[in-house]
């Protein structure tokens, strides 16, 4: 019976009248990419794509299909991928877009590490880690005041340049620290939309956890053909949604 399932794939219908907060993220498996569009407030997958990479034209096409299907998207949460961001801004320019806070933290910490050597780096790490504690408008304002003070006191130091020996070319003396600072600075305009729009997820953690479960299941079923792998994922999406809808 298992093979019979994988020779075909399911279809399902979701009510389009309910306003939705959309999560968008992609994951790679077996040389392929799965992009999932999930209505997080409904705990339902409304669209997905099997592709080779996170292509902005394809994602924009998916979003236009979602819009034409009648879904009322009132907020979107994404990671920091440029392709996804460009597609969202093209199709839904006026819809609030939340940057995944965990992705921002992860990217910044990959530059300065968990154990920064300088006081400036340790202060920035403290700011980055404390993002997780923000719940209210007052929390946000307090965090921004600390961030602005850090910038005022350290931006010149962080962005210091020097000349290469025997050359007019310059480089950033503390490039890792600067990369973390620039990444955080660019994320801030879309980092606190979840406060202005209650219900909008501040992370894509739900999808990342879901992707982890899918990959665990695929490892248990090694040897499936490409078509059956894709159908396996479609059934997994379907049964996961059905289980959530019956709770």
Report residues per predicted region.
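Conserved beta-strand -> loop -> alpha-helix junction used to position metal-binding or nucleic-acid-contacting
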Residues: 76-82, 87-128
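Acidic/histidine-rich catalytic cores and adjacent linkers
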Residues: 75-85, 122-247
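Short alpha-helical interface patches
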Residues: 4-6, 11, 57, 101-111, ...
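Generic recognition of cysteine residues
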Residues: 30-33, 100, 108, 159, ...
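RNase H-like nuclease fold core
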Residues: 1-82, 86-94, 187, 206
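Alpha-helix N-cap recognition
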Residues: 55, 100, 132-136
């Amino acid at each position: 019976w298992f093979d019979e399932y994988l020779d075909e794939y399911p279809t399902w219908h979701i009510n389009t009248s309910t306003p939705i907060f959309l999560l968008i993220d992609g994951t790679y498996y077996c040389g392929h990419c799965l992009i999932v569009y999930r209505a997080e407030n409904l705990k339902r997958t409304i669209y997905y794509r099997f592709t080779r990479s996170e292509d902005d034209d394809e994602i924009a096409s998916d979003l236009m299909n979602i819009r034409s299907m009648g879904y009322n998207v009132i907020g979107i949460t994404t990671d920091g991928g440029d392709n996804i961001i460009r597609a969202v801004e093209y199709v839904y320019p006026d819809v609030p877009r939340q940057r995944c806070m965990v992705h921002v933290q992860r990217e910044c910490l990959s530059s300065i590490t968990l154990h920064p050597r300088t006081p400036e780096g340790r202060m920035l790490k403290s700011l980055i880690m404390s993002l997780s504690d923000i719940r209210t408008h007052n929390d946000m304002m307090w965090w921004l005041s600390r961030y602005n003070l850090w910038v005022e006191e350290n931006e010149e130091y962080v962005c210091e340049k020097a000349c290469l020996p025997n050359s007019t070319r310059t480089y950033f003396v503390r490039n890792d620290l600067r990369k973390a600072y620039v990444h955080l600075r660019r994320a801030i305009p879309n980092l606190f939309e979840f406060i202005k729009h209650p219900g909008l997820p501040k992370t894509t953690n739900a999808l990342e956890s879901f992707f982890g479960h899918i990959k665990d299941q695929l490892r248990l079923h090694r040897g499936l053909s490409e078509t059956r792998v894709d159908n396996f994922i479609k059934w997994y999406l379907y049964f996961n949604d059905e289980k959530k809808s019956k709770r």
